Amino acid sequence: MNQRRYYGQFDPPVDQYLFERFFPTLRGGVSLECGSYDGIAESSCYFFEKHRGWHGVNVEASPPIFPQLQRNRPRSTNVHAALSNHSGTARFKHVISPQHGENFGNGSLAHQPAHHAELIKEGCSFVDYEVRTITYPELIAEAGIVRLDLFVLDIEGHEAPAIESMRQGALLPSVLCVEHGHFGVEKMREMLGGLPFRFDSALHVNSFYVNELNPPARPGALAKLWDRVRGD
């Protein structure tokens, strides 16, 4: 019997909340995490790959961080790009922390002013990199995604352009977990207006939405029993 371990932020961890609320018995699913950092530390999706047999697609823009992601998640599809509303290149601001050095996951194409001021107050410095940008439909095609159970979007203030690109016509996830910390719950709901997502809940700095056209399957009694027997 494998002992479950969660990797996400906060208490309860984000991945535990996702697992217990939306995917308590699903095995062999597909996850997409944008802003995946090194693929393990504070990851909302690694649990599903490690313990539930999912395939993970990870997107990370930071040049210093992406090689760590490749080493940590060799079984995943790892994409070195920044999700946005246009394809091409853009300036990515990588953050260097006085405590953690370059291993810090607050980089962004567009920090919100309050977040940027907070990072400066903490003594952080910044290095600009020219990085590849990719739209949501291009990402789905490039990663070969034909099924998507979970999309976790946490790109430090650049969520609005990424959500805009989700309107361009591509496969949408059954469950969307998006960081609302820089905007608030209600503003995030406005950003997602017109897309087929129903607000489900909010926890810590994340909002959770269910795709009304393709919701996650509700596990039956037999599936729940089998999952308890397996114990992993």
Feature locations, PLM:
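Phosphate/nucleotide-binding beta-alpha loop and adjacent structural elements of enzyme active sites
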Residues: 1-232
